[in-house]
Regions:
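Long, low-complexity intrinsically disordered segments
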Residues: 241-254
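Signature of dsDNA virion morphogenesis modules
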Residues: 1-244
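Terminal short linear interaction segments
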Residues: 251-273
Length: 273
């Protein structure tokens, strides 16, 4: 259902409340492709340390490991949706059939990594660690993928090896969605608004619009390398995070606070000595 955003706010809010069930049903009906996250990936070396983001792998190797940031939370996207931290927890615990694909194509030849070659988990970053001016945090959906030259997709092996992959996007199904409206006349929706609004990074944009949809649970189907994305968040392209693959239920690795790229690198090096 198309939302008539040109209506005066009070009429728009009335429309949203009246059609709430249908709007949310539409959002949950089919697999959604989120706005792409423009970050690229971290190559991971044999010691489990990440290199500079998007750095080409110059060695003649048959296998590489990359860390791809697939999705982030606490940001209203082009669908008026805000992914809430924790939305992936149930899915990551229960669903072991997750793929790292090329451009959301669910085909054998498009598979980049799966099974034992893919470790999906969540990790909390500050927005400053991702090169943004905002205070606060975002919980990222992260894929650690082992990609083989002789695997299903040698083309994407070479794209990652040459540092050409700049964008990723998650393919998912929404499970739980709440509507938030900034108007006390809509009791339940106003309560949802007050619960989440202060954690939204682009808060001013959301306040100007007056409503959003809080996605509190979603099922991960796949994460894809995509050629071009519409997400306008572009994090810093330098980091030195140590790879510690999660055991059991995916948990959030420890985070550190960044002021500059040099400071974060030095802090993390000290942390992992």
């Amino acid at each position: 259902m198309e939302i008539p955003k040109s209506l005066p706010k009070k009429e728009l809010f009335t429309f949203l409340e009246k059609n709430l069930n249908r709007i949310i049903a539409d959002k949950k009906a089919n697999m959604k492709k989120a706005d792409a996250f423009s970050f690229g990936f971290f190559p991971v070396d044999k010691e489990g340390l990440t290199e500079k983001a998007n750095k080409p792998v110059t060695e003649d190797v048959d296998e590489i490991t990359v860390r791809a940031i697939i999705n982030t939370t606490n940001l209203m996207d082009s669908h008026d949706d805000v992914h809430i931290p924790g939305l992936w927890n149930k899915s990551l615990k229960e669903n072991k059939d997750i793929w790292h694909d090329q451009e959301h194509k669910h085909e054998f030849a498009s598979t980049i990594a799966e099974g034992k070659g893919l470790k999906p988990y969540v990790k909390t970053y500050t927005w400053k660690e991702l090169g943004q001016k905002w205070e606060g945090e975002t919980q990222a959906l992260v894929f650690d993928s082992t990609i083989s030259k002789d695997g299903n997709n040698p083309f994407m092996f070479n794209q990652y090896k040459q540092g050409r992959v700049k964008n990723h996007s998650v393919g998912m199904n929404y499970v739980k969605v709440e509507m938030a409206i900034n108007d006390k006349d809509y009791k339940d929706e106003f309560k949802t608004w007050n619960k989440y609004i202060d954690q939204v990074a682009n808060k001013e944009q959301v306040e100007e619009q007056g409503y959003f949809f809080a996605v509190t649970e979603a099922k991960v189907i796949e994460g894809s390398a995509v050629k071009r994305g519409s997400n306008w968040v572009t994090p810093t392209e330098d980091n030195n995070l140590k790879s510690e693959p999660p055991e059991g239920t995916p948990q959030e690795p420890e985070k550190s606070t960044q002021l500059t790229s040099d400071e974060i690198i030095n802090t993390i090096k000290k942390h992992f000595k």
